[in-house]
Amino acid sequence: MKNHPYRDMTAAMVRTGILGFGGGPSVIPLIRHEAVNKYKWIDDDEFGEILAIANALPGPIATKMAAYLGFKLKGTLGAIVAILAHILPTCLAMVGLFAAVNVLSHSAIVAGMIGAVTPVIAVMLGIMAYEFGQKALKGFGWVTGILFFIIAFIGLQTLQINPGLVIIIFLAYGAFHFKLKDKITNKHSKDKGMSAS
């Protein structure tokens, strides 16, 4: 089976763009399905890293993720194609339906469609959150992982701290934590080697 990166990338980004009802939160699991599960361009760990960085930077998350995937696959041109494939269909649809926006905004049919698709989006986000939660607990252990969940929840929900700032703090801690862990492991290995000799 031949690999068609531009065709696959364009099809994937068009699908995520037109099916992402509700903005960023609903698009994230769709992009994950295309990039991780279907085409296997990246793994879950890399997806989590992209998501964290995209959240920390200004602008729409989905567009930044599309740009990253396009750049990874086909460089600068790939990034441009991925962004255009993601945003153009909905932009064109919006322009085409502009005359009917006022009518559609109060339409019972549109309200019903959004109401029906919301539980599906919630389930997709829940599955993704569960899988990322498992990875977090595996990486840091149950005690540290649960503590991080609590701190993040308090920071985001109770204290209303900017999500980008919370992500930057946790990224910085993660880098420090694993660097320290590697240093301790290397020192322990050296000590064992010296005692053995």
Curated annotation (Swiss-Prot):
Pfam families referenced in this protein's UniProt entry, alphabetically: Chromate_transp
Localization terms from the record: Cell membrane
Keyword list, A-Z: Cell membrane, Membrane, Transmembrane, Transmembrane helix, Transport
Gene Ontology molecular function: chromate transmembrane transporter activity
Regions crossing the membrane: 11-31, 50-70, 79-99, 108-128, 136-156, 158-178
Cell membrane as UniProt keyword: yes
Subcellular location, principal: membrane
Identification of the protein by name: Uncharacterized transporter YwrB
Organism: Bacillus subtilis (strain 168)
